């Protein structure tokens, strides 16, 4: 009776991790020899781990990453791929998010820009940041609809609160004036307060004047920039 009553109270207090750990302790004879402080410490450790797992699960679900399982540990390091390991380590640390930097991933189709952006989004979730993946054409359609139903301002506020916003397929097609203005609103609201990742097929400015052939310095180029803030 006392066992079920205690478990019920733990669940009422939303201490699911402690409840599971307590059930395990009751079934493991070795735990009976532990002191009260030792058993309590194990229960608290399990609760913290359980909450971390639940928070990560929630953040990953909200992020809506195109490649939900993408992670930096699985980055393809085969010979022939030019990877700046120090840059990858810096990005993995999350310092660029804390410093409100933004990332631009450029390169031709198929080099892994979207996968890498999703891996960075997943890493951000691991570190407790919120993330959101959106294809730029889909975002523009959402903003167009928001103008019509009166939710444009609320949509901008929601986007401005995301710690890491991933905008895929940036510059895929020419934009009308209204669409350019909407994107500027999104970027301006996030300037200096949140981080944004853009992926684009647009080449870096390495081509010669008048050149019509896109050129990239590497298969997938990474650049970061800081949006100026008003003093």
From Swiss-Prot:
GO MF term list: ATP binding; ATP hydrolysis activity
Domain of life: Bacteria
Keywords: ATP-binding, Nucleotide-binding, Transposable element
GO BP annotations listed: DNA replication
SUPFAM superfamilies in the cross-refs: P-loop containing nucleoside triphosphate hydrolases
Binding site for ATP: 107-114
A Pfam family assignment: IstB_IS21
CDD domains attached to this UniProt entry: AAA
Family under the similarity heading: Belongs to the IS21/IS1162 putative ATP-binding protein family.
Name of this protein: Insertion sequence IS1162 putative ATP-binding protein
């Amino acid at each position: 009776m006392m066992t079920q009553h205690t478990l019920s109270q733990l669940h009422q207090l939303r201490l699911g991790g402690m409840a599971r750990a307590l059930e395990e302790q009751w079934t493991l004879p070795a735990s009976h020899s532990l002191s009260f402080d030792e058993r309590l410490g194990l229960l608290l450790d399990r609760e913290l781990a359980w909450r971390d797992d639940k928070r990560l699960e929630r953040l990953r679900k909200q992020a809506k990453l195109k490649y939900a399982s993408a992670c930096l540990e699985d980055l393809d390091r085969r010979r022939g791929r030019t990877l700046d390991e120090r840059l990858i380590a810096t990005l993995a640390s999350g310092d660029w998010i804390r410093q409100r930097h933004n990332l631009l991933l450029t390169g031709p189709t198929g080099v892994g820009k979207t996968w890498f952006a999703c891996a960075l989004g997943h890493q951000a979730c691991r570190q407790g940041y919120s993330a959101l993946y959106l294809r730029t054409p889909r975002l523009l359609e959402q903003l167009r609809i928001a103008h019509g139903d009166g939710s444009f301002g609320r949509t901008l506020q929601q986007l401005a609160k995301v710690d890491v916003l991933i905008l895929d397929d940036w510059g895929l097609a020419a934009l009308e004036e209204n669409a350019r203005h909407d994107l500027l609103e999104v970027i301006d609201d996030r300037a200096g307060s949140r981080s944004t990742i853009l992926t684009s097929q647009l080449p870096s400015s390495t081509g010669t004047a008048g050149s019509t052939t896109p050129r990239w310095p590497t298969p997938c180029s990474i650049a970061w920039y800081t949006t100026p803030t008003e003093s």
